[in-house]
């Protein structure tokens, strides 16, 4: 799947989103990470985290398994990096 990935698409992901993606990559596969833990690992504020997660979901680099739930001030309950997200980071990171 990474073969069809355009590096320009990855470069368009802003630095905040890359910071979140890198933080998520430190956790085990399949582990769901809540916004507060992302905040602790990155130092980003909730608004920045929400925007980054939205961008990463659109790029298929992360998933929000239960999109109908959220845990304010975050627009999601938990998030996990996809295998595709890990591959992109490994190759282009």
Language-model features, listed with the residues they occupy:
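Short, locally clustered residues in the helix-turn-helix/winged-helix DNA-binding domain
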Residues: 22-29
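A short, conserved structural fragment
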Residues: 57-69
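Short, solvent-exposed loop/turn segments that connect beta-strands within catalytic domains
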Residues: 70-75
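Short, amphipathic alpha-helical interaction segments positioned at domain boundaries
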Residues: 77-93
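Short alpha-helical segments that sit at the start of domains
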Residues: 1-21
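Short amphipathic alpha-helical interaction segments
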Residues: 43-59, 76
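Long, compositionally biased intrinsically disordered regions
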Residues: 1-3, 37, 91
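Short acidic, hydrophobic short linear motifs in intrinsically disordered regions
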Residues: 29-41
